[in-house]
Regions:
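Phosphate-coordinating loops and pocket residues in cytosolic domains that bind phosphorylated ligands
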Residues: 205, 478, 525-529, 543, ...
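ATP/adenylate-binding site constellation spanning eukaryotic-like Ser/Thr protein kinases
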Residues: 209, 431, 478, 520, ...
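Structural signal for short hydrophobic segments within the conserved structured cores
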Residues: 480-484, 540, 545-548
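Short hydrophobic beta-strand motif reused across regulatory alpha/beta modules
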Residues: 515-523, 582-589
Length: 602
């Protein structure tokens, strides 16, 4: 009883504050204030997540010898995934996987509404997974967390649909800006990946969130960079062919990553009713890979740093420490290649068996190793002019981010801001463009948008498609119709027509299944001929509808049917053919115009 009273008291205080805000602070001003709060809270969430990961890893691996492998690598990931699955099953009780896809889905179909637990659940779950060695990234969970913070603040302050999308975008951009200390990358990530349109009205709140998150991350975590890089070999024009080829290689690696990830997800989906089988199967795959290739442990950023800081094979060879390859410098290229091509299996096994994490970091790691792999092979076999391995490691990361996310600006600015390698802008652009052109031949959507695009639930920059995505067919279905039976005499049909408010009457059987339709405009020439009343029944006068809409049909398909038939109304039926209502062309276009106006408004 006390808990209920306390909850009602808190709710009342919030309600009074919201009423006060509506009276004294404009929604525009409140949006800017919330943008600052979102940036602050996103940086706090990032700090806690990385704190959880660091403390768990320190606890588990502090006694390891850096030059030898350890059998505990076989055990840690399985323990972490098991603990994560227990946390999700008994505490969260909801699906929190595919963080960025979940944000896109909320924007497209749920009025940007995310559940309250998303403000913290992904932080804890992914912290446990990564800390115990799960081969996934923390970025997607943080993006989901930041977006959920923005969404829930928007719900509390009763913001309209467009402002809700903006606040979700603020949370996502703040998350990326805070994680990488890269405000511009956070801004363009929201534009390219979440596909939030940037007008002058929305630019300022997102910038505020990005800058706030970056500043507080510096306060919480210091000014150290995620990657240690010093440019010693500036870009030269004669390396352009190698950059183009690297971009093509990154595009193909992106395709490999996306297709393999999708295949692995399907494999684990077949075991959804056998959670312990998933845990054992995925855990064994992951732990075996980490045991053989320790660079797959956790996020893997430390391994990339070894490649960036090294100047020769002896220094680069440190990436093989704690593995069976340790001390065998001649196997470096083989080791790098194995990590490049097996990281996707480690990531899929982590998430598929019950872990929680994203594909952002794996994309960076695969890109870094792929870039080094390409450059090392190029130099060893003297394919052309010398290319610096460190530079190509960075460019590989940008290329994979571009290919996997279809986000060239994110790839360029993220790597430039992360490393301070602004002098590499030209080769970064060449690699990213080549990567995007290559992956676009095979996939038209990013790894996050692919699933939603197939279901027609993806909000894009294309205003027409975006409007159709935002339209809810259920809200368009009209129930105001006058049904009749097929054996009704024409004499009584005239009486039924006089009671109807529409130009049509659906003909139904006893179960409500649609048999046909009486179009009043088509029988007007005989309707007043009383001598025909006893000679005709409804089943002789009814017509088949020009098209029928399924109740789960996508709005773009509905619009195509209206265009093909030129009908004023079309019936909506369920899987058994039972009539659920009608959709009017006039109402569809009216709602469509309102949504387009909202999207286009500054």
């Amino acid at each position: 009883m006390m808990d209920e009273e306390l909850s009602e008291y808190k709710q009342g205080r919030i309600e009074r504050f919201v009423v006060w805000q509506k009276e004294h602070i404009s929604d525009r001003q409140m949006t800017l204030i919330l943008a600052f709060v979102i940036g602050l809270l996103a940086s706090v969430a990032d700090f806690f997540l990385h704190g959880i990961v660091h403390e768990i890893q320190l606890l588990l691996t502090s006694g390891f010898q850096q030059s030898s492998y350890n059998l505990l690598f076989l055990l840690f990931p399985i323990i972490g995934i098991y603990l994560t699955s227990l946390f999700i099953k008994y505490v969260v009780r909801d699906n929190i996987s595919h963080g960025i896809t979940r944000v896109l889905y909320a924007i497209s179909t749920k009025n940007s509404r995310l559940k309250g637990h998303n403000c913290w659940s992904s932080v804890v779950a992914s912290g446990i997974t990564i800390g115990f060695g799960g081969s996934v990234g923390a970025e997607a969970p943080i993006v989901l967390t930041g977006s959920a913070i923005g969404s829930n603040l928007g719900q509390i302050f009763r913001m309209d649909k467009k402002t809700m999308i903006l606040l979700v975008g603020c949370g996502a951009s703040a998350a990326i800006a805070g994680v990488f200390k890269a405000p511009i990358a956070g801004l363009v990530f929201t534009l390219e990946v979440l596909m939030v349109d940037l007008s002058m009205a929305s630019l300022l709140p997102i910038l505020i969130s990005c800058v706030t998150a970056t500043c507080f991350t510096y306060i919480f975590m210091g000014d150290s960079s995620l990657f240690d890089f010093t440019l010693t070999n500036p870009w030269e024009l004669n390396r352009t062919p190698a950059c183009i080829l690297l971009g093509i290689f990154c595009g193909l690696m992106s395709l490999y990553f996306m297709r393999t990830m999708s295949w692995c997800e399907g494999l684990f989906a077949k075991m959804k009713n056998h959670p312990y089988c998933k845990l054992v199967f995925g855990g064994l795959i992951l732990s075996s890979l980490i045991f053989l290739l320790p660079s797959l442990y956790g996020e893997g950023y430390s391994a990339v740093n070894v490649l960036l800081k090294g100047q020769n094979e002896a220094e680069w060879g440190q990436v093989m420490n704690r593995s069976l390859f340790s001390g065998h410098q001649n196997l470096l290229i083989l080791y790098i290649g194995l990590v490049t091509f097996t990281k996707v299996f480690a990531t899929s096994a982590t998430n598929g068996s019950g872990g929680c994490g994203g594909t952002f970091a794996p994309s960076l790691i695969i890109g870094g190793f792929a870039g080094f792999f390409f450059a090392r092979l190029w130099n060893v076999y003297e394919v052309g002019v010398y290319v610096p391995e460190q530079n190509f490691t960075l460019m590989g990361m940008a290329g994979l981010i571009t290919g996997v996310m279809h986000a060239p600006l994110t790839g360029i600015f993220l790597i430039a801001e992360l490393t301070g390698g602004y002098q590499l802008f030209m080769p970064l652009m060449i690699v990213c463009i080549s990567s995007l052109l290559t992956i676009s031949i095979f996939e038209s959507h990013s790894i996050y948008a692919l699933r939603l695009a197939r279901e027609g639930k993806l909000l894009t920059h294309h205003i027409d498609r975006a409007a159709l995505t935002l339209m809810s067919m259920q809200s368009l279905v009209e129930k105001d119709y006058h049904p009749i039976k097929e054996d009704l005499p024409m004499e009584k049909l005239v009486s039924e027509i006089s009671r109807s408010n529409n130009n049509f009457l659906p003909v139904l059987d006893e179960a409500g299944v649609l048999l046909g339709v009486i179009d009043i405009t088509k029988i007007r020439h005989i309707i007043f001929r009383t001598e025909l009343y006893k000679h005709f029944k409804v089943k002789q006068l009814m017509l088949q509808p020009s098209a029928v809409i399924s109740e789960n049909e996508r709005m773009d398909e509905v619009m195509q049917k209206f265009d093909k038939t030129d009908a004023a109304q079309l019936p909506v039926v369920d899987i058994n053919g039972v009539l659920k209502g009608y959709i009017s062309r006039t109402k569809v276009y009216e709602v469509y115009r309102h949504i387009v106006a909202d999207i286009s408004a500054e």
